A protein has these predicted regions:
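Amphipathic alpha-helical coiled-coil segments
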Residues: 1-53, 60-71
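Terminal intrinsically disordered/low-complexity segments used for targeting and assembly
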Residues: 69-80
């Protein structure tokens, strides 16, 4: 499960980079009048969704790490 969380986190990091790049392109096109307001909002929403997914993946990964530390009895070392 931990490996899956790490893979997902890495994928979401890549997705966030792509979403940021797409958002920048959309902003430039919008300022040039080559993109509608609705399309700009869609690009903004895609970026927000990517940010939300990465936060969720980071949380899930950290919770998995903490669970493993609890199971292994090393949680007190982690908390120091």
């Amino acid at each position: 499960r931990d490996r899956n969380n790490l893979r997902l986190l890495n994928l979401e990091r890549q997705n966030l980079i792509a979403a940021k790049e797409n958002h920048e392109i959309a902003k430039e096109r919008y300022l040039l009048g080559d993109l509608s307001g609705i399309e700009m909002r869609e690009a903004q929403k895609s970026l927000l969704d990517a940010e939300e997914r990465i936060l969720s993946a980071e949380y899930d990964t950290k919770m998995c790490e903490i669970s493993l530390l609890q199971i292994s009895g090393k949680i007190t070392e982690y908390l120091k």
